[in-house]
Amino acid sequence: MLPVPMMMIKDQPTFHHLSESILIRLGYPTELMIHSHDLIEAEQLLQQHLPNLILIDLCLDQSERISFIRKIKKVHPDAHIIVVLAQQETSLLFAAIQAGVQGYIFYEHTEAEIFNHIKTILRGGAPIHDALAQYILSYQLGFHKTQSTTKINQPIQLTAIEHDILKLISDGLSPQHIAQQMTVALYKIEGHIRNIYQKITYL
């Protein structure tokens, strides 16, 4: 891995100590890990260092941080952005994908799951789990409930295979199992998932 900076915008110290140790295993030297607790400082650090990987904790100031993600993608579109959030916050995760993130980590994830998610993202893939797949499919139906209303959604232009992958993931299959079932290479399944992310970003 190239020695390029990465940045963490963090709220949960214990979780981010774990993330830092995983990033070291993935090749990021500690001297190139930049830490920030607020968006004002993070914006300054972003301009100074142009990190290629940015971890953003969505525990606090969620709407402001979603807006910050959009700002990052405008000025640094090649940055890999990973959000950190609770597993049950699927609508927040969907909003983050709309803003342009490449992946996510849950507080509930094990060390191995965090390692695999970050590794998948850095090699060009995108993680997905059953609840997110179900959410995308329900969004695709045209209506989605928010806390205050039900609105008509702009449909996601999914291909037949992208729809099939989402259905299989919503049924509990992993990308690895889907690749075996479809007798295709895993990277092709990961490519379809990445394309789904990109289509959500364009909504």
Predicted regions mapped to residue ranges:
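Conserved catalytic core of two-component sensor histidine kinases
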Residues: 108, 115, 159, 166, ...
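Hydrophobic residue at a beta-alpha junction
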Residues: 60-64, 168, 173
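N-terminal regulatory/sensing modules of transcriptional regulators
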Residues: 1-145
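Helix-turn-helix/winged-helix DNA-binding modules
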Residues: 76, 157, 170-171, 200-201
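Regulatory hinge/linker segments at domain boundaries
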Residues: 138-167
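Recognition helix of helix-turn-helix DNA-binding domains
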Residues: 172-203
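A cross-family signal for key residues in well-ordered alpha-helices
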Residues: 70, 98, 167, 180, ...
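Conserved beta-strand elements of the Class I
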Residues: 5-7, 166, 170
